[in-house]
Amino acid sequence: MKHRISTMVLLGGTLAALSFSSLPAQDAPNPKAAQKLARALEGRTPGKPVACIANLRGSAKMSVVDDWTILFRDGGTIYVQKPKGGCPKLSRGQYALVKRQVGGSQYCEGDIGEVVDPVSGFFAGNCVFGPFVPYRKVG
């Protein structure tokens, strides 16, 4: 019985280690993404995070830094969005971020964005929005 329990514990620990090792490394963005984000936010300071922003239409208003960071521009403010768990495949450039909404004209924390192929309409993944951090120019 002791052997069986220790085998189960070992197996469970191994499975947990394997599942955690396959998670993307959110804390270590690639250098190109870090440089792109730094350039976009140069001369700006972060404000207090907000739960919702206006639903900005048009590709010029949204830019993807990587699967972990999306920028939304509204006038002189850039909102940094870090989806909880990332937004798989979004940074590949061939996919679009679509938010299915019923009424309302905002992106809000907790909303689910879908990553889709705009040509075929096939679903490629999804992401859950976190808070939006506004960055404004200093002075």
Q: What residue spans do the PLM features occupy?
A:
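Bacterial N-terminal signal peptides
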Residues: 9-19
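N-terminal secretory signal peptides
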Residues: 23-78
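Disulfide-bonded cysteine motifs in exported proteins
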Residues: 47, 81-82, 103, 122
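A short macromolecule-binding patch
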Residues: 78-86
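Helix-rich interaction surfaces within compact, conserved domain-sized segments
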Residues: 88-139
